[in-house]
Structure formats: structure tokens, C-alpha cells
Amino acid sequence: MYNLNALIDRLIEISKNNNLIEDMDTVYTRNRLLSIFNENSYTPCEEKLTLSFHETLNELINIAIEKKIIENALYSKDIFSSDIMNIFLPTPSLINKEFYKRYAISPKESTDYFYSLSKSSNYIRTDRIAKNINFKAPSKYGTMDITINLSKPEKDPKEIALARNSVKSNYPKCLLCIENEGYEGTVTHPDRANHRMIRLSLNDRTWMLQYSPYLYYNEHCIILSEDHVPMKIDISTFKNLLSFVDKFPHYFAGSNADLPIVGGSILSHEHYQGGNHRFPMNDAKKLFDFSIDGFEDVECEAIKWPISTIRLRGENIDSLVLASDLILKKWRDYSDETLDILSYSNSEMHNTITPMVRKEDGKFVVDLSLRNNRTSKEHPLGIFHPHEEVHHIKKENIGLIEVMGLAVLPGRLLKELEKIKEYLRDEISLDNIEEYHRPWALELKKKFDYLKSATDLNDFVNKELSNKFVSVLEHCGVFKLNEEGLEGFKRFTNSLNN
């Protein structure tokens, strides 16, 4: 085991290099670190370590376990590591002052600062995110982004039992609330001692900007309401998203839908997602264009995308807000029984929108994906939701990120796809493959045996996985991309002028 003083010196050195602290802070920081290890003396160490940031942090955690300061449990180790890094962080007020000082230079300067801080403080778990499998694969709609999510570690049985028997608390109310800023964490609530938020004003309300601890794309940020209020999509949503992109034109912003099945995993707290990433949907081609009376300054088109989407372009924020709101209101009450689209059943609302906003070539671009969450006997999880035949790949809600063409697929697929590759190489029998994958594996075998001499196995499986993800998205499209669906889509866009 490494010497504690040498590890403390190394962490201080790394934090200086990452601009978390300055030379003047060395003694203070060292003493605070000694304190949490219950040490009251320090001897300079001749040994100079060259460990990486995460290696150093992990060795410090091992010493804390050895000294019985913490339990050898994931939640306890995470809480302790956040407490360590919190020592290196300024208070929220100082971080906000620095953010806006840099914002006066440029919006990108301010987000670069906050993003770097969030990584250097280990709030963004770059070590765990690096475990994800990411690749791009072609499809009939363009190149798709595929991620097999391996970043979130699984809890062990002991931890699960502790969580089950723990006293429930309503503080913080949810994972997004402002009360998470600096929160110690428990066995049931993640560590947030090293968590900081930037205060924003959007549409005369206070919002918070933070980064996701488990990024799915570059600079994946969350914009959350100061108040714990439920998700909703209305005119204020469009005002907020456009206001955010106006303030940070290098970022996009979007919202999950506000209804179950088609919404995100957190419906209890109003929030948006954003970041500095170009999604496959951004490059979708025009399907047809149309116009809306009274909005001559707004370009309108439907795009060629598996989830039925209207794209608006314009320079005037007010016009885009009103045009988006008109489309939302029309869609809320729109039904087309020939396509299984019903806006209400037994007074339950089914229609909503997943909106995304970005700035491109001096114009704002608003993408409005039309969603419907109705269920049926044939499709009890949702008519416009991944159907049973694709559940072996993805059965969860299709939220904002997936709508835009980035698949976030379960970690189990890593080993399962390797088995399928072994089967395609004739190394194992079909019986060795999970039962829910077998129909797909048989289908792939026929294709691969035909193409074997002309294709790489990994590329082949990646492309087929991308095609399966496209099927997931197509199931969610309310207007299918066939003659009947296209006519239905045009009926809806025509109704915008009625």
C-alpha cells in the first residue's frame, strides 16, 4: 500500500495542474486531507508518485478502508471520494462569479471552465464513462450513434440490503433538486459533496446548469428548474429552450416529453438536457416542406426521420415560440384513427412533443418530434413504443437522447453480442445464446454466411445492431415512412392552417 503522505502530495500536485488550487493553497489543502484521514501530523515524502488522478484517488480510498474510516462498499467509497475532492472546490457563489466573469468574454469560455472543473473534481465520472462502448454505424437514415452503457457500477447484495432497510428521507426530494448541491449522500442517494450548479435566468425564472455525472455525449448538461415542479411541455418550454440556446449558442437544448411511456425517467422535476454534440437527427434530410399562415418568417418542413418530426428555422425567437406552441396545441387534440392516433381515451391525454433547439448558420432550428403514449392489448407497453420483437435490444422509454439518434443500450449486450459473434463464427451452438436473442441470431447467421467473405464480423454486427435500433425508433413514429403514413403526416401539417 502506498504512503498516505505521498498520495496526498500527488493529489495536490494533480489538482494544481488541473487549476483547482494554487501554490498558496498547498498547506491548507494538505491539512484538510490529513483531517479526514484522522491524522494530525505530516512528514514530507522523498518518494514522488506518478499515479494518475483516479489511481491516486483509489489508493486513498483503500487507505480509508484499511483504517476503517469507511466501509468497503461502493456507496461509502463514492461518498468518501467526493468528500476528498470537495476540499479542492470553491463554494457555489465563487464558482458562479468566475463563470459569469468568463461569460463576459464568451459563452464558450464560461462552459469550458465549468466543464473542466466538473471533470477535474471527479463530479463527472470520466473513469467510469470510459468503460462505455461507443461506435457509429450506417443506417437508411444516416449514421447512428450507438452506446453500450457500462458506466454505472452495479450494487452488491450487501448494499442492496442496506438500501432496502434504510430509513426513507424526502431530502433532497429527487436526484435533480438544488438541495443536492454539496449533499453528503447515503446508501440510497448518490454522493454530491463535490456537486456545483450555475444559476441561470430563463424566461424570468431561476434555473440551474450542471453536467451529468455520467455523460452520454460531449458536454452533456442538465438545465433544471430551481423549484421541484413536474415536467410539462407548453409555450414556456419553447421560450426556455430558445432562451438557453440564445445565451449559449454553441450548445443545443431539448426536453423529454411530459407523459409516461414517451417521457424520460424523471417526470417529477422539470428539466432539460443540452450539450455540445451533433446528433444524427441534425443531419436528417427534408421529407417535404409546408407553410403556416401568419409565420412567413419561419421555414417549416417535415424531416426524413423514423420518429415523425417537424423542423422549424428562423431568426426571430418570438415567431418560433408561437409557431411551436401552435403545433403543440394542434397535436395535443389531433386524432387519426386510420393510423391508431387518438389524442384522448377516457379523458387521458396521449399526445405530446419532444422538442430540441440549436443554432446553425445564424438561425435557430427547432425540431418537434410528435409523440403518442397510447397502449393497446396488442402493445400493452405502448403502440408507439418499442414493440416486443425489439425488447431483446431495448425495451425502456425512448427519450430525448434516443429520439435524436443516440442509442443508449443496456450493458448486458456486451457479453451477449460476443456470444452471437461466436455463433456466427460456428464456435458455439444456438443453444448457448440467450433465448430472447435466438430469432435475431438465426437471421444474422443467414446474412453473414452469405456475406462472410466480403465483410468484417465486428462491422457486420455493429451495423445490424444499428438497424435494430432504427427499428426501435420506427416503432415510436406516429406517421410511418410509407405512403399511408406520409399522407397522414401531410394531413396533420395541413391542419395547422385550419
From Swiss-Prot:
Superkingdom of origin organism: Bacteria
Compartment annotation: Cytoplasm
EC number annotated for this UniProt entry: 2.7.7.12
Any one Pfam family match given in the protein's UniProt record, by short name: GalP_UDP_transf
UniProt entry keywords in alphabetical sequence: Carbohydrate metabolism, Cytoplasm, Galactose metabolism, Nucleotidyltransferase, Transferase
Biological processes, Gene Ontology terms: galactose metabolic process
Cellular component aspect of the GO annotation: cytoplasm
EC category name: transferase
Catalytic function, reaction form: alpha-D-galactose 1-phosphate + UDP-alpha-D-glucose = alpha-D-glucose 1-phosphate + UDP-alpha-D-galactose
Associated pathway: Carbohydrate metabolism; galactose metabolism
Molecular function as annotated in GO: UDP-glucose:hexose-1-phosphate uridylyltransferase activity
HAMAP family: GalP_UDP_trans
Cited NCBIfam families: PRK05270.1-2
Family the UniProt entry places it in: Belongs to the galactose-1-phosphate uridylyltransferase type 2 family.
Protein name as catalogued: Galactose-1-phosphate uridylyltransferase
Protein species of origin: Clostridium perfringens (strain SM101 / Type A)
Gene name in the database record: galT
